[in-house]
From Swiss-Prot:
Lineage: Archaea, Methanobacteriati, Thermoplasmatota, Thermoplasmata, Thermoplasmatales
Gene name of the record: tal
Purpose: Transaldolase is important for the balance of metabolites in the pentose-phosphate pathway.
Protein name in the entry: Probable transaldolase
Catalysis performed (reactions): D-sedoheptulose 7-phosphate + D-glyceraldehyde 3-phosphate = D-erythrose 4-phosphate + beta-D-fructose 6-phosphate
Keyword Cytoplasm included in the entry's annotation: yes
Protein source organism: Picrophilus torridus (strain ATCC 700027 / DSM 9790 / JCM 10055 / NBRC 100828 / KAW 2/3)
Length: 223
């Protein structure tokens, strides 16, 4: 199981790398728009991320037609060997996935909301499929159930496409993804940090440090 960071913020990426917490990065047009500054455009942001991350980086096309997707995907692919092309789950997107996979250009099929869509993406050669569990929760569905369904279907038919759980909102999403057997989980940095936290851990550490002052009143480590 791998963990990806869902961000275009280079500082968050560098922090997460320093802690040894991530294996890759996912971005989208919204995340990139938040990092855009005067004199620093899309290409600059993406190139920085690709150079910083020693792992796959998903970058999304914004074209909605087949040829536009292929043209943009080719440009993104040429930015770095670790670039993965995010293609939306549409009919045009499925056609683009097939073409790109035949050229051995890795694709992350995004905006997936049911297991049939995920199956079509796998049939057309997607390297990753990204079901959006949090957004399904938002409309009253159990977003994690789609992960269970996809895992079963992929196992049934020996699809090699990796399940990349997206729209992750909390550690419960992460835990359930691990139990089901998702291949990758991508999440914002605040969720990643929460994975290492537990109130009983904080409580226990505070108690140990308090007791240590009985051994070393100034808190030093006398060795």
């Amino acid at each position: 199981m791998k963990i990806f960071l869902d961000t275009a913020n280079i500082d968050e990426i560098k922090d997460a790398i320093e802690y040894g917490l991530i294996d890759g990065v996912t971005t989208n047009p919204t995340l990139i728009s938040r990092e855009q500054k005067e004199g620093r455009g899309f290409s600059d942001i993406v190139k920085d991320i690709l150079k910083t991350v020693d792992g796959p980086v998903s970058i999304e096309v914004v074209a909605t037609d087949y040829q536009g997707m292929i043209d943009q995907a080719t440009k993104i692919h040429n930015l770095g060997p670790n670039a993965v092309i995010k293609i939306p789950m549409t009919l045009a997107g499925l056609r683009a996935m097939k073409t790109l996979s035949e050229k051995h250009i890795p694709v992350n099929c995004t905006l997936v909301f049911n297991a049939i869509q995920a199956t079509l993406a796998a049939r057309n050669g997607a390297e990753y499929v990204s079901p959006f569990v949090g957004r399904l929760d938002d409309i009253g569905e159990d977003g994690m159930e789609i992960i269970n369904q996809i895992r079963t279907i992929y196992n049934n038919y020996s699809f090699k496409t990796k399940i990349l759980v997206a729209s992750v909102r909390n550690p419960v999403h992460v835990l359930r993804s691990m139990i089901i057997g998702a291949d990758v989980i991508t999440m914002p940095y605040d969720v990643i940090k929460k994975l290492a936290m537990h109130p009983k851990t904080d409580e226990g550490l505070s108690k140990f440090l308090s007791d240590w002052k009985k051994v070393s009143p100034d808190g030093s480590f006398p060795i």
